[in-house]
UniProtKB/Swiss-Prot annotation:
Originating species: Enterococcus faecalis (strain ATCC 700802 / V583)
Encoding gene per record: eutC
Domain of life of the native organism: Bacteria
Function as written in the Swiss-Prot or TrEMBL entry: Catalyzes the deamination of various vicinal amino-alcohols to oxo compounds. Allows this organism to utilize ethanolamine as the sole source of nitrogen and carbon in the presence of external vitamin B12.
Protein name as annotated: Ethanolamine ammonia-lyase small subunit
Any GO CC annotation of this UniProt entry: ethanolamine degradation polyhedral organelle
C-alpha cells in the first residue's frame, strides 16, 4: 500500500465515523450546521513532514518526572550520567517516550553491528583496504577467531603497501560498530598525526581491516615489523551510544601475546572522550612506548 492509498483509506474511515455519529444523533442537522461536516472532512488530509528524531534528545537534560520534589537536583544528578534516571511511569509501565527511546537506541545498536563501514569513506581517507578471513558479518560474529587472521592475498596487500620496520603503523578496524568509525575517524586521525608531529614522529599508509577483531593488529605487527601498532576499532554498541571507539596500542605486537601487553584508550565519542582530545592522548602514549620500548602493564610499571 502506497502513501496515497493510505491517505484515502484514513479519509474514508473518518468520513464513515462522522456519518455514523450523525445517524445516532437525535438532533436535526440544520442547513447552518452542514459546513461542520465539510470542515471535518477537510481536516482528514494528512500533513506532510518529518517526525523528530528522539535519539537526538539529550537524556541528561530531559526531565520526565512530572511531580519531582526537587527538579533542579534531579537534573543536576542526571548531568553526570547518560543512564536512564528518573524516567517516570504511567501506573506500573514506563512512559511512552521512555519506551520509544529505549527501542530507538536498541535499534541503533543493532544497526551499528550489522552494517558495514562505507566504502566511500575508506576511499576518501585513502586507507589500504583489507579483510580478515571472515566471509560475512554472521561468520564474523559467530567465529571471533576468523576475525584475527588474514589469508595470503590480504597479507600480501598489507606487506606491499606499508613501510617495513616503521616506527608507527596505524590500523583502522570496523569491529563491532561501523557507526563508531564513521563518526570519529575523520577527527581522531588528524589529531593523532598532529600530536605525533610535535614529537617529530609520523605514520605512513593506514590499513583498514573489514571484519576486524583486536588481535588482527598482532598479525599486522608481524607482517610490517613496526615498532608500535595502533588499532582504532569500533566498540560493542550499547543503549547509551552506538558510536564509541577504542584505541588498542602495543609495542612490537606478536600473534598469541598476552592481552596485558596492550594499552587501551576507550570510550572515544562525543559523549565520552572527544575524538580530538583522544587523538592527542594517543600520540602521547605512542611516544612513551617508543621511548620505553614497552606497552600495556609493562609501560605502566615503567612510568
Amino acid at each position: 500500500m502506497n502513501e496515497k492509498e493510505l491517505k484515502e483509506m484514513i479519509a474514508g474511515i473518518l468520513t464513515e465515523m462522522v456519518a455514523d455519529n450523525q445517524a445516532v444523533s437525535t438532533a436535526t442537522v440544520t442547513a447552518e450546521e452542514k459546513p461542520v461536516t465539510t470542515h471535518v472532512t477537510e481536516t482528514t488530509e494528512i500533513e506532510e513532514g518529518l517526525i523528530p528524531d528522539i535519539t537526538e534528545v539529550d537524556l541528561r537534560k530531559q526531565l520526565l518526572l512530572k511531580n519531582a520534589v526537587d527538579p533542579e537536583a534531579l537534573l543536576k544528578m542526571k548531568a553526570f550520567s547518560p543512564a536512564r534516571l528518573g524516567v517516570g511511569r504511567a501506573g506500573t509501565r514506563y512512559m511512552t517516550s521512555s519506551t520509544l527511546r529505549f527501542r530507538a537506541d536498541h535499534a541503533a545498536a543493532q544497526d551499528a553491528v550489522f552494517s558495514d563501514v562505507s566504502e566511500d569513506l575508506v576511499k576518501e581517507m585513502n586507507f589500504i583496504s583489507t579483510k580478515t578471513i571472515c566471509n560475512s558479518k554472521d561468520e564474523y560474529l559467530t567465529r571471533p577467531d576468523y576475525g584475527r587472521q588474514f589469508d595470503e592475498e590480504n597479507s600480501e596487500i598489507i606487506r606491499k603497501n606499508t613501510t617495513p620496520k616503521a616506527k608507527i603503523q596505524m590500523v583502522v578496524g570496523d569491529g563491532l560498530s561501523s557507526a563508531a568509525i564513521e563518526a570519529n575517524i575523520k577527527e581522531v586521525l588528524p589529531a593523532i598525526k598532529q600530536g605525533l608531529n610535535m614529537y617529530n614522529l609520523d605514520f605512513d599508509n593506514v590499513v583498514f581491516v573489514k571484519y576486524c577483531r583486536v588481535p588482527a593488529m598482532d598479525k599486522i605487527g608481524e607482517i610490517t615489523d613496526a615498532d608500535v601498532v595502533c588499532l582504532l576499532v569500533g566498540e560493542r554498541p550499547g543503549l547509551v551510544t552506538a558510536e564509541s571507539m577504542s584505541a588498542y596500542i602495543a609495542y612490537k605486537p606478536t600473534v598469541g601475546m598476552p592481552e596485558a601487553r596492550r594499552t587501551v584508550i576507550s570510550n572515544i565519542h562525543k559523549g565520552g572522550t572527544p575524538a580530538v582530545e583522544a587523538g592527542a592522548y594517543i600520540a602521547e602514549i605512542i611516544k612513551k612506548m617508543l621511548d620505553k620500548k614497552k606497552s600495556g602493564i609493562d609501560l605502566k610499571e615503567a612510568e
